[in-house]
Amino acid sequence: MAKKSMIVKANRAPKFSTQGYNRCKRCGRPRAYMRKFGICRICFRELASQGLIPGVTKSSW
């Protein structure tokens, strides 16, 4: 889980537009962010395995 201070800092408008970055809406993780879902890969995997993300299924071949 990300520090609350870092989550608050990320919500503020950056001084320059290129300094902005995405964070996971669920845990606040800044890395491995999946733009389509708005969450990080770890949260995505947890929610997908529980079946909470519509249209996402575990692949098997």
Curated annotation (Swiss-Prot):
GO BP terms in the entry: translation
Keyword terms of this UniProt record: Metal-binding, Ribonucleoprotein, Ribosomal protein, RNA-binding, rRNA-binding, Zinc
Gene3D superfamilies in alphabetical order: 30s Ribosomal Protein S14, Chain N
Cofactor: Zn(2+)
GO molecular function, one term: zinc ion binding
GO cellular component: cytoplasm; small ribosomal subunit
Cofactor note: Binds 1 zinc ion per subunit.
Superkingdom to which the source organism belongs: Bacteria
Binding sites annotated in the UniProt record for Zn(2+): 24, 27, 40, 43
PANTHER family from the UniProt entry: 30S RIBOSOMAL PROTEIN S14, SMALL RIBOSOMAL SUBUNIT PROTEIN US14M
Family, per entry: Belongs to the universal ribosomal protein uS14 family. Zinc-binding uS14 subfamily.
Protein name as it appears in the record: Small ribosomal subunit protein uS14
Organism from which the protein derives: Herpetosiphon aurantiacus (strain ATCC 23779 / DSM 785 / 114-95)
Gene: rpsZ
